[in-house]
């Protein structure tokens, strides 16, 4: 089975070793055809606390690390500053 990966934007880094990553999904509405943007937020493990708000990161699925955390930061693609 392939490892699931997502690319998103860090929207919160206020927790220790955890970041919240927002991932946008753009899809046409089934009836009206308008492009609808849906945002999903994932908590991801950041072992070294390197991620900052505004960074674009790649996350990958892992074993459950806590009640709500099932993803880990694989790499930082772009930094904000």
Swiss-Prot record:
PROSITE patterns: RIBOSOMAL_S17
Transmembrane segments: none
This protein's UniProt keywords: Ribonucleoprotein, Ribosomal protein, RNA-binding, rRNA-binding
Name of one Pfam family that matches: Ribosomal_S17
A GO term, aspect molecular function: structural constituent of ribosome
Ribosomal protein as UniProt keyword: yes
GO biological process: translation
Keyword rRNA-binding appears in the UniProt entry: yes
Family listed: Belongs to the universal ribosomal protein uS17 family.
Assembly notes: Part of the 30S ribosomal subunit.
Function as written in the Swiss-Prot or TrEMBL entry: One of the primary rRNA binding proteins, it binds specifically to the 5'-end of 16S ribosomal RNA.
Name this polypeptide is given: Small ribosomal subunit protein uS17
Gene responsible for this protein: rpsQ
